[in-house]
Curated annotation (Swiss-Prot):
It catalyses: tRNA(Leu) + L-leucine + ATP = L-leucyl-tRNA(Leu) + AMP + diphosphate. It comes from Shigella boydii serotype 18 (strain CDC 3083-94 / BS512). Its EC number is 6.1.1.4. It is found in: Cytoplasm. The lineage of its organism: Bacteria, Pseudomonadati, Pseudomonadota, Gammaproteobacteria, Enterobacterales. This is Leucine--tRNA ligase. One of its GO terms (molecular function) is ATP binding.
């Protein structure tokens, strides 16, 4: 064994061994308990970043640990390979998205191997291959036949100059990112999947997910947004149709003083025919894309349509306004406004001088003061005719019942969740498998024409999708009739909604899933990824699982038992102000810093001498130029060091602060482990350990070894607090470094301890552990070695610490045998100098003894 730890030599050797032996390839094995450990698949952007490294290290630690417990562990990896960035990169680099993507996959695959992740590479998949997306296309046609897919018009961002649809991220300050033209909202036909048909199940089954973070579950609950309320119909004077609104607060109905409709509502459109101000307002709304998240903070605007609705219970005429806070795609596109008891309605009414009528008493029974804001709390009704004096629940039911009896109301359950629009007017995605015949009939692409293959050898002009630009591509024949293919492609969330299931049978040719393999491996035991995916991906992932279950492919209700959301990786961020006042961000690698005695940065400059402003730690990002390249760190310190730092620096679900000093610390620790094994093995063979013949000191050290095994097992397995597991191993290493190594049994004990340490570190730092296991002559490869088991007998304490008090004041702490009698403890206490001093010349009046813990001598 060489004396120095040289990761650059051992890591590539061990990785080659894993490759040649196919160590991590698995097949279904009914005789073993399975464990499916999955990290969210990466987008092949070109290089791994530290966020990836953290995500995949956590997954690998768990997978390797479960494997050492004797389970059949599946840990696959693949590539979420479709998506918009590839189109931009292709234009920039004068290539096509496909070769750019495949080059990136090859490069990043080598980076993953360099980090030593134990993946089953035989299951690798890329979502941009027809072998993968053909099954998604087939499944979509099945969903269409089941009535779960439909087409309707929906608004998109449209650039009139480029004549193209823009993704939300391509709209910068309301303008096209390419040509700076003002973006319009345009209605175009798009495909939708009925996720709303599963809303109740998606909501209720959250209760089954005991091992998902509460934050994620509550985000999904809010996103689904189930509410119970009443749908109310209003007659409108001089208008051919009625207006329908939905409210969750029918108890406030007598305080409704106006209605508001979306700018795109037919009533607003009709009113605008003779109202130029309203027409201009509708135009303005059409070209302002409003994300629902921004609704709360944006300025509320509106125009009176001139129409009057009739309040069904009071007969009063109330105005109908067009307002920018009502969205056509939500509910009925119309809302009732109760400005006395809803803050948004209050602000709008105050701005435009509309009537504000209070109908709920304040908590103390007085009339509410509405001079500054609305009273939004529930309470007792007044000003409400026959409903006066009713509390919230009674009023809710009485008014709902009355409206229902009159035929103008209906109790309804509503959802915030909208159906999933899966059409994208982009090129680099899976083609949507639908065709339109000459007579206008729309139908799914027949099975014998699947997959609809996306041509990869294309020229990108950066504006129009190549399959839209080429009229020949869309032409096909169905049942002998000419037809046109759909030229939109799927939302890339489609591919990432079922990849986890395809990993169980990536080569299967007969269908989307081989049920036997899928049901052996699924559900996923632990799924690891960022919390930013809480609603979109993780909701579609759950939805798709239920769709596949209802198609008879899987027999479980949920795709993953446990979800672990890792924290972000932060790094120092620095900038200097340029000549034009712009911020130039400087990589922390290039910052020369001065620190105070507490280690805080007080001054910084770069190599060119610019004074740098230090903005603290923030998420690693391109925009702040504070990403640290994992490859550079692996080349400098080795993969094991980077992995160890990642797992030690912070709990897995908290943010991690990247500090190179911490990386150096992890590296020093691994050098110490190497050195101890080197010194131990240099002394030659080791005798067998004789547990019964150990000295007290040897017993104490062995107790520490086995207590550490018990703690690390609990920390990794049950608690998943990996940082505390590593801390416990480090603490044990400090004790081993000081332990005597001269006697035969000292060395036998050291052998037992080091074999345990190397196995406990193996999930974190597998290359060094593989090598040290061989040097220690461990049985077989460490990859097939069992996890160490704590010896209960070794952990039994044979002595205990007793606190000695005189008149309730602590005077000594003494170590006594566990089975010592009260007399023996008193005798031992009397030998302590301080205790003897306080007992000198006084009488002990009373003795309080708590066996093995406390001795209190009361004197006087």
């Amino acid at each position: 064994m060489q004396e120095q730890y040289r990761p650059e030599e051992i890591e590539s050797k061990v990785q080659l061994h894993w490759d040649e032996k196919r160590t991590f390839e698995v097949t279904e094995d009914e005789s073993k308990e399975k464990y499916y450990c999955l990290s969210m698949l990466p987008y092949p952007s070109g290089r791994l970043h530290m966020g990836h490294v953290r995500n995949y290290t956590i997954g690998d630690v768990i997978a390797r640990y479960q494997r050492m417990l004797g389970k059949n562990v599946l840990q696959p990896i693949g590539w979420d390979a479709f998506g918009l960035p590839a189109e931009g990169a292709a234009v920039k680099n004068n290539t096509a998205p496909a070769p750019w993507t495949y080059d990136n996959i090859a490069y990043m695959k080598n980076q993953l191997k360099m980090l030593g992740f134990g993946y089953d590479w035989s299951r690798e998949l890329a979502t941009c291959t027809p072998e993968y997306y053909r099954w998604e296309q087939k499944f979509f046609t099945e969903l269409y036949k089941k009535g779960l897919v439909y087409k309707k018009t929906s608004a998109v961002n449209w650039c009139p100059n480029d004549q193209t649809v823009l993704a939300n991220e391509q709209v910068i300050d309301g303008c096209c990112w390419r040509c700076d033209t003002k973006v319009e909202r345009k209605e175009i036909p798009q495909w939708f999947i009925k996720i709303t048909a599963y809303a109740d199940e998606l909501l209720n089954d959250l209760d089954k997910l005991d091992h998902w973070p509460d934050t994620v579950k509550s985000m999904q609950r809010n996103w689904i947004g189930r509410s119970e309320g009443v749908e109310i119909t209003f007659n409108v004077n001089d208008y051919d149709n009625t207006l329908t609104v939905y409210t969750t607060r029918p108890d406030t109905f007598m305080g409704c003083t106006y209605l508001a409709v979306a700018a795109g509502h037919p009533l607003a459109q009709k009113a605008a025919e003779n109202n130029p101000e309203l027409a201009a307002f509708i135009d303005e709304c059409r070209n302002t894309k409003v994300a629902e998240a921004e609704m709360a903070t944006m300025e509320k605007k509106g125009v009176d349509t001139g129409f009057k609705a009739v309040h069904p219970l009071t007969g009063e005429e109330i105005p109908v306004w067009a307002a920018n806070f009502v969205l056509m795609e939500y509910g009925t596109g119309a809302v009732m406004a109760v400005p006395g008891h809803d803050q948004r309605d209050y602000e709008f009414a105050s701005k435009y001088g509309l009537n504000i009528k209070p109908v709920i008493l304040a908590a103390d029974g007085s009339e509410p003061d509405l001079s500054q804001q609305a009273l939004t709390e529930k309470g007792v009704l007044f000003n409400s005719g026959e409903f006066n004096g009713l509390d919230h629940e009674a009023a809710f039911n009485a008014i709902a019942d009355k409206l229902t009896a009159m035929g103008v109301g209906e109790r309804k359950v509503n959802y915030r969740l909208r159906d999933w629009g899966v059409s994208r007017q982009r090129y680099w995605g899976a083609p949507i498998p639908m065709v339109t015949l000459e007579d206008g009939t729309v139908m799914p692409t027949p099975d014998d024409q699947l997959p609809v293959i996306l041509p990869e050898d294309v020229v990108m002009d950066g504006i129009t999708s190549p399959i839209k630009a080429d009229p020949e591509w869309a032409k096909t024949t169905v049942n002998g009739m000419p037809a046109l293919r759909e030229t939109d492609t799927f939302d890339t969330f489609m591919e990432s909604s079922w990849y986890y299931a395809r990993y169980t049978c990536p080569e299967y040719k007969e269908g989307m899933l081989d049920s036997e393999a899928a049901n052996y491996w699924l559900p996923v035991d632990i799924y690891i990824g960022g919390i930013e995916h809480a609603i979109m991906h993780l909701l579609y992932f759950r939805f798709f699982h239920k769709l596949m279950r209802d198609a008879g492919m899987v027999n479980s209700d949920e795709p993953a038992k446990q979800l672990l959301c890792q924290g972000m990786v932060l790094a120092d961020a620095f900038y200097y102000v340029g000549e034009n006042g712009e911020r130039n961000w400087v990589s922390p690698v290039d910052a020369i810093v001065e620190r105070d005695e507490k280690g805080r940065i007080v001054k910084a400059k770069d190599a060119a001498g610019h004074e740098l402003v230090y903005t603290g730690m923030s998420k690693m990002s391109k925009s702040k130029n504070n990403g640290i390249d994992p490859q550079v760190m692996v080349e400098r310190y080795g993969a094991d060091t980077v992995r160890l730092f990642m797992m030690f620096a912070s709990p897995a679900d908290m943010t991690l602060e990247w500090q190179e000093s911490g990386v150096e610390g992890a590296n020093r620790f691994l050098k110490r482990v190497w050195k101890l094994v080197y010194e131990h093995t240099a002394k030659g063979d080791v005798a067998a350990l004789n547990v019964d013949g150990l000295t007290e000191d040897q017993k104490a050290l062995r107790r520490d070894v086995h207590k550490t095994i018990a703690k690390v097992t609990d920390d990794i397995g049950r608690r998943q607090t990996f940082n505390t597991a590593i801390a416990a191993i480090m603490e044990l290493m400090n004790k081993l470094a000081k332990a005597p190594t001269d006697g035969e049994q000292d060395r036998a004990l050291m052998q037992e301890a080091l074999l345990a340490v190397v196995r406990m570190l193996n999930p974190f730092t597998p290359h060094i552990c593989f090598t040290l296991w061989q040097e220690l002559k461990g049985e077989g490869d460490i990859d097939n070695a069992p996890w160490p088991v704590a010896d209960e007998k070794a952990m039994v304490e044979d002595s205990t610490l007793v606190v000695v008090q005189v008149n309730g004041k602590v005077r000594a702490k003494i170590t006594v045998p566990v089975d010592a009698t009260e007399e023996q403890v008193r005798e031992r206490a009397g030998q302590e100098h301080l205790v003897a001093k306080y007992l000198d010349g006084v009488t002990v009046r009373k003795v309080i003894y708590v066996p093995g813990k406390l001795l209190n001598l009361v004197v006087g």
